[in-house]
């Protein structure tokens, strides 16, 4: 399941970070890894932006990230 498919407030574990479209380059995937989006890492999708759109507020540990939909679609998760 993609991070974008999780309901607001749901917790999950990162399974895989991979390019979801040709627009995604290796630099973005590397950056997501540097931010902590790594396999096995627990996270929580807190909420979406206005109208259920961007950005997605994602909590990893004690750090809150605001991700664009394109970035969030690169993160495959296992719901808890």
Role assignments for model-derived ranges:
Residues 1-80:
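Compact, glycine-rich, soluble single-domain proteins
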């Amino acid at each position: 399941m993609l991070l974008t498919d999780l309901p607001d407030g749901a917790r999950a574990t990162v399974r895989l970070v991979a390019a979801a479209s040709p627009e995604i380059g290796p630099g973005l995937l590397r950056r997501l890894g540097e931010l902590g989006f790594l396999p096995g890492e627990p996270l929580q999708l807190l909420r979406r932006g206005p109208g259920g759109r961007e950005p997605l507020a994602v909590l990893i540990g004690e750090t809150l990230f605001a991700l664009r939909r394109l970035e969030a679609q690169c993160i495959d998760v296992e719901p808890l």
